[in-house]
Amino acid sequence: MSRVSQARNLGKYFLLIDNMLVVLGFFVVFPLISIRFVDQMGWAAVMVGIALGLRQFIQQGLGIFGGAIADRFGAKPMIVTGMLMRAAGFATMGIAHEPWLLWFSCLLSGLGGTLFDPPRSALVVKLIRPQQRGRFFSLLMMQDSAGAVIGALLGSWLLQYDFRLVCATGAVLFVLCAAFNAWLLPAWKLSTVRTPVREGMTRVMRDKRFVTYVLTLAGYYMLAVQVMLMLPIMVNDVAGAPSAVKWMYAIEACLSLTLLYPIARWSEKHFRLEHRLMAGLLIMSLSMMPVGMVSGLQQLFTLICLFYIGSIIAEPARETLSASLADARARGSYMGFSRLGLAIGGAIGYIGGGWLFDLGKSAHQPELPWMMLGIIGIFTFLALGWQFSQKRAARRLLERDA
């Protein structure tokens, strides 16, 4: 085995272990934020939505800067520093009794993610061969689902005692992850050339096709982020107990572990990436619309199952499509910018979703936020369809001219 192949194989195992630690640390804390501050402390959902949206926007919106800096200085220092900042954010969250302190803790957490998330994504693109990326992204998603359940179960159990224990556990896991990277991650370069920060950012901004695709995905993310805000609140309201939230993540884990990899393997042989992304988004959108009308836990979990199936179909295709569009000369910058759709959609989804949830509750129209999210998903589906048809038309024109 050549040294390059050996490095790739070792890199795969490193990425999987690193991802599990990050997912555990995140899901111990974040699914329980809405339960803690909305249900236990009586805050308005929009206040918590602002906190979650701030974290999302900071982490993903500034991702291009984190990626560009990593292109220049390498992945290791950015990842280690970012994970320590995330740990500090969780520690601060444990003592938050005022909205401004919760917002500050989410700001710290988001800045940490800005530093470590783009270089970690770029390492996947660097180490995994193009023809294997779809399957590897599916493995990461399966791991995400299992880690989400374990983290949510652990967090729910700790929440019975004290929310500070929840946050302390998340902080410790990120400190361990920082130590793991500091000890074992080689000083790998992310890009084929040592790209200056400004040049990497400029290269991305000139790629109009990539920019349009990323911004359109904001609508997709407005739906996706509700697993952290409105879906846990809805499950808690219908079940009457916060412990039911863990079953929501258990459903995701079961579906992901049984369906994600087989669906990815089968669909990559029969369907284009664009079609898989659009089909998944359509299922997610249609499953969102009736959520506000259900009154039983069984009906709610059925709709959540459909939503997760849509995500299982769409997410590996979205990741693979984003990676395939990235320029190898500025991988960090591209993978950082690819998070901008998540920044915009996540922020609007959290803040707007929280506001609509409060509005629907006060107006006795609980279906309002869910119908709006479904409509946004349908419009995003149509916008992506138009973009992909334009791209195919341009490709046919080039082939004819040749």
Swiss-Prot record:
<dbReference type="GO" id="GO:0022857">
    <property type="term" value="F:transmembrane transporter activity"/>
</dbReference>
<comment type="function">
    <text>Confers resistance to norfloxacin and enoxacin.</text>
</comment>
<feature type="transmembrane region" description="Helical">
    <location>
        <begin position="99"/>
        <end position="116"/>
    </location>
</feature>
<dbReference type="InterPro" id="IPR011701">
    <property type="entry name" value="MFS"/>
</dbReference>
<dbReference type="GO" id="GO:0046677">
    <property type="term" value="P:response to antibiotic"/>
</dbReference>
<keyword id="KW-0813">Transport</keyword>
<feature type="transmembrane region" description="Helical">
    <location>
        <begin position="277"/>
        <end position="297"/>
    </location>
</feature>
<protein>
    <recommendedName>
        <fullName>Multidrug resistance protein MdtH</fullName>
    </recommendedName>
</protein>
<keyword id="KW-1003">Cell membrane</keyword>
<feature type="transmembrane region" description="Helical">
    <location>
        <begin position="340"/>
        <end position="360"/>
    </location>
</feature>
<keyword id="KW-0046">Antibiotic resistance</keyword>
<dbReference type="InterPro" id="IPR036259">
    <property type="entry name" value="MFS_trans_sf"/>
</dbReference>
<keyword id="KW-1133">Transmembrane helix</keyword>
<feature type="transmembrane region" description="Helical">
    <location>
        <begin position="244"/>
        <end position="264"/>
    </location>
</feature>
<feature type="topological domain" description="Cytoplasmic">
    <location>
        <begin position="265"/>
        <end position="276"/>
    </location>
</feature>
<comment type="similarity">
    <text>Belongs to the major facilitator superfamily. DHA1 family. MdtH (TC 2.A.1.2.21) subfamily.</text>
</comment>
<feature type="transmembrane region" description="Helical">
    <location>
        <begin position="214"/>
        <end position="234"/>
    </location>
</feature>
<dbReference type="Pfam" id="PF07690">
    <property type="entry name" value="MFS_1"/>
</dbReference>
<feature type="transmembrane region" description="Helical">
    <location>
        <begin position="13"/>
        <end position="33"/>
    </location>
</feature>
<feature type="transmembrane region" description="Helical">
    <location>
        <begin position="368"/>
        <end position="388"/>
    </location>
</feature>
<dbReference type="InterPro" id="IPR022855">
    <property type="entry name" value="Multidrug-R_MdtH"/>
</dbReference>
<dbReference type="InterPro" id="IPR020846">
    <property type="entry name" value="MFS_dom"/>
</dbReference>
<feature type="topological domain" description="Periplasmic">
    <location>
        <begin position="160"/>
        <end position="164"/>
    </location>
</feature>
<feature type="topological domain" description="Periplasmic">
    <location>
        <begin position="235"/>
        <end position="243"/>
    </location>
</feature>
<dbReference type="GO" id="GO:0005886">
    <property type="term" value="C:plasma membrane"/>
</dbReference>
<feature type="topological domain" description="Periplasmic">
    <location>
        <begin position="361"/>
        <end position="367"/>
    </location>
</feature>
<feature type="topological domain" description="Cytoplasmic">
    <location>
        <begin position="186"/>
        <end position="213"/>
    </location>
</feature>
<feature type="transmembrane region" description="Helical">
    <location>
        <begin position="300"/>
        <end position="320"/>
    </location>
</feature>
<feature type="topological domain" description="Cytoplasmic">
    <location>
        <begin position="1"/>
        <end position="12"/>
    </location>
</feature>
<feature type="topological domain" description="Periplasmic">
    <location>
        <begin position="298"/>
        <end position="299"/>
    </location>
</feature>
<feature type="transmembrane region" description="Helical">
    <location>
        <begin position="139"/>
        <end position="159"/>
    </location>
</feature>
<keyword id="KW-0472">Membrane</keyword>
<feature type="topological domain" description="Periplasmic">
    <location>
        <begin position="34"/>
        <end position="98"/>
    </location>
</feature>
<feature type="transmembrane region" description="Helical">
    <location>
        <begin position="165"/>
        <end position="185"/>
    </location>
</feature>
<feature type="topological domain" description="Cytoplasmic">
    <location>
        <begin position="389"/>
        <end position="402"/>
    </location>
</feature>
<keyword id="KW-0997">Cell inner membrane</keyword>
<feature type="topological domain" description="Cytoplasmic">
    <location>
        <begin position="117"/>
        <end position="138"/>
    </location>
</feature>
<keyword id="KW-0812">Transmembrane</keyword>
<feature type="topological domain" description="Cytoplasmic">
    <location>
        <begin position="321"/>
        <end position="339"/>
    </location>
</feature>
<dbReference type="InterPro" id="IPR050171">
    <property type="entry name" value="MFS_Transporters"/>
</dbReference>
